[in-house]
């Protein structure tokens, strides 16, 4: 995804080693309860998209569901590329007996989740997903629906304790 966001002042890349460990069957303990498949989309020699299909078996048992997840998704603004990536994961999920696809999600709730739908002009963080504004448009076009809202806030720490708080501290 680094090339996809090259020159974007709001994108904060994740740590490559951390992502490689997360995606590694040998290093990520989530694979004790999960299985995954990874797809890359190419145009010529150039990678133009990626997606992971994940089945979190433990979560499916707890919630009595047959859901696959999609995550680690990035793509250029091209309908053919997006459709091919999602068709591959949808087909894989159906072959595995899943009846729904949910995401973007990772292996566990400790992984990055969600898709940015506004605030594209705000700097991202390493703890959140950043994506281009065209991502939600492609999701809607393919018939995917938003499940819930996630909100991110900035908290500014003042250089000094505000006078009002000092007075409250004295009273207490």
Task: Tell me the role of every PLM-derived stretch.
Residues 38-40, 46-56:
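Conserved beta-strand in the GNAT
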Residues 4, 39-41, 153:
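Short beta-strand element of the conserved SAM-dependent methyltransferase core
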Residues 44, 56, 73, 106, ...:
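Structured loops at beta-to-helix junctions and adjacent beta-edge loops in soluble globular domains
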Residues 129-172:
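Acyltransferase donor/substrate-recognition loop-hinge adjacent to the catalytic core
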């Amino acid at each position: 995804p680094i090339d996809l966001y090259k020159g974007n002042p709001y994108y904060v890349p994740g740590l490559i080693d951390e992502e490689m460990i997360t995606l590694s069957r040998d290093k990520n303990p989530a694979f004790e309860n999960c299985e995954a498949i990874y797809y890359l989309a190419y145009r010529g020699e150039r990678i133009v998209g990626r997606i992971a299909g994940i089945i979190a078996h433990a979560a499916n048992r707890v919630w009595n569901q047959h859901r696959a997840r999609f995550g680690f998704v990035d793509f250029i603004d091209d309908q053919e590329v997006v459709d091919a990536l999602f068709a591959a994961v949808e087909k894989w999920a159906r072959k595995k007996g899943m009846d729904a696809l949910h995401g973007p999600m990772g292996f566990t709730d400790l992984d990055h989740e969600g898709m940015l739908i506004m605030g594209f002009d705000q700097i991202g963080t390493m703890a959140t997903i950043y994506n281009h504004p065209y991502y939600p448009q492609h999701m809607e076009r393919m018939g995917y629906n938003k499940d819930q809202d996630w909100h991110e806030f900035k908290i500014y720490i003042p250089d000094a304790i505000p006078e009002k708080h000092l007075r409250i501290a004295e009273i207490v």
